[in-house]
Amino acid sequence: MVRRFKRGTKYRRGSRTHGWGRVGQHRKSGGSGGKGMVGFHKHKWSLVMKYGESGTGWPFYGKHGFKQPPPISIEWRPINVGTLAELVKELKAEGKVREEGGKYVINLLELGFNKLLGGGTIDLPVIVYTPIASRTAVEKIEKAGGEVRIIHVIHR
């Protein structure tokens, strides 16, 4: 069970300071060199050298980088144009892709991707709906007779 009270002392009950000398010498943080991690580059440097990594003093001293907050960072799930061409052929064989004016229509969000990159080659005319596409990906798809349509969605 957690104790929710400060433990008292039974030692030296008759004395005023319980063996800590002058009144106030065992109060607050003056006798311990400061509160918390104060003084690690001054009078507590020996603790840094003893318990920290050699040379850097981590984790006691120095800067430790930056962690992007989760709501700001976007998790990208990219797909290359060449992989998309293979995927279209598989979906066409299964009958899961629709045609519109002789071109295959693909929505990358429905397939679990949110970015189109320009790696590989494509020879099929396709209409691709995607939130983001690279310039080379757009050029390759337009060269094959297709088009890229950018859709605006919240990436979360």
Swiss-Prot record:
GO terms for cellular component: cytosolic large ribosomal subunit. InterPro entries: Rbsml_uL15_N, Ribosomal_uL15, Ribosomal_uL15/eL18, Ribosomal_uL15/eL18_sf, Ribosomal_uL15_CS. Keywords: Ribonucleoprotein, Ribosomal protein, RNA-binding, rRNA-binding. Residues 1-16 have a biased composition (Basic residues). It holds the Pfam family Ribosomal_L27A. Disulfide bonds: none annotated. One of its GO terms (biological process) is translation. One of its GO terms (molecular function) is structural constituent of ribosome. Residues 1-37 are annotated as: Disordered. It comes from the Archaea. The keyword Aminoacyl-tRNA synthetase does not apply. Binds to the 23S rRNA. Belongs to the universal ribosomal protein uL15 family. Part of the 50S ribosomal subunit. This is Large ribosomal subunit protein uL15. It comes from Pyrobaculum aerophilum (strain ATCC 51768 / DSM 7523 / JCM 9630 / CIP 104966 / NBRC 100827 / IM2).
